[in-house]
């Protein structure tokens, strides 16, 4: 049987303490990239961004129902705060955000919901987060985990607990993001075919609702 001497215990525990301390002194890195590097790269890309469009695949996991729903469509953003995204498939709908107003148009039901948009509404309009990632330092606390940038809102943001960003080394710096809310529901958004600064007009973000559509207004 090997007898562990007091000096050996001290050496081992001392080494562990040194390694833990050393890890805290190092900047947070993933493959040589620090949190600050990633944030700087994203915010620099946003400085030159006027508009953006592309495709998305959204997977929403609802914990209580143990169900995952998948949606596909297109999104369009004109900074600072004009958005349009179109869900394709059986239940088509279009969502418009223009500054502090949101309109959700459901084609099949021939109805539209109109309401206010603010920080508390982000959880219901996840693609809108893309318009705000140019202000990461102001809006979020950031860290790195498993190669992803983890963002936690500094102020309440519609029940959002954290956002995981998968960054891209080419073109637009955000490849996908995951939103976790207070109920541990999870929303994954994967972006593709992204084009930037194509000259989207402001009028594109104003819905042209056909006659006969019922408009339901909600004010918070």
Predicted regions and their residues:
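Extracytoplasmic
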Residues: 49-51, 70-72, 80, 90, ...
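Bacterial N-terminal signal peptides
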Residues: 16-27
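Bacterial N-terminal signal peptides that target proteins for export
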Residues: 3-18
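Boundary at the C-terminal end of the N-terminal hydrophobic targeting segment
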Residues: 30-34
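An acidic-aromatic
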Residues: 72-124, 187
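Flexible, processing/modification-adjacent segments and terminal tails
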Residues: 35-37, 41-62, 66-68, 104-161
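Gly/Pro-enriched, hydrophobic low-complexity segments
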Residues: 135-219
């Amino acid at each position: 049987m090997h007898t562990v001497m007091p000096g050996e215990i001290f050496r081992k525990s001392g080494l562990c303490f040194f390694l833990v301390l050393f890890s805290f002194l190092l900047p947070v890195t993933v493959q040589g990239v620090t949190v600050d590097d990633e944030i700087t790269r994203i915010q620099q890309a946003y400085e030159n961004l006027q508009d953006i469009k592309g495709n998305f695949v959204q997977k929403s996991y609802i914990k209580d129902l143990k169900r995952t729903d998948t949606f596909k469509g297109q999104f369009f953003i004109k900074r600072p705060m004009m958005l349009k995204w179109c869900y394709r498939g059986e239940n088509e709908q279009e969502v418009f955000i223009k500054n502090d107003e949101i309109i959700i148009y459901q084609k099949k039901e021939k109805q539209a919901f109109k309401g206010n948009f603010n920080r508390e509404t982000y959880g219901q309009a996840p693609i809108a987060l893309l318009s705000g990632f140019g202000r990461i330092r102001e809006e979020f606390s950031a860290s790195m985990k498993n190669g992803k940038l983890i963002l936690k809102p500094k102020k309440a943001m519609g029940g959002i607990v954290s956002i995981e960003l998968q960054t891209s080394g080419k073109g637009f710096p955000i490849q996908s993001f995951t939103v976790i809310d207070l109920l541990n529901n999870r929303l994954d958004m994967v972006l593709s075919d992204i084009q930037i600064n194509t000259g989207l007009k402001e009028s594109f973000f104003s819905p042209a609702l056909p006659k006969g559509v019922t408009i339901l207004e909600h004010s918070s």
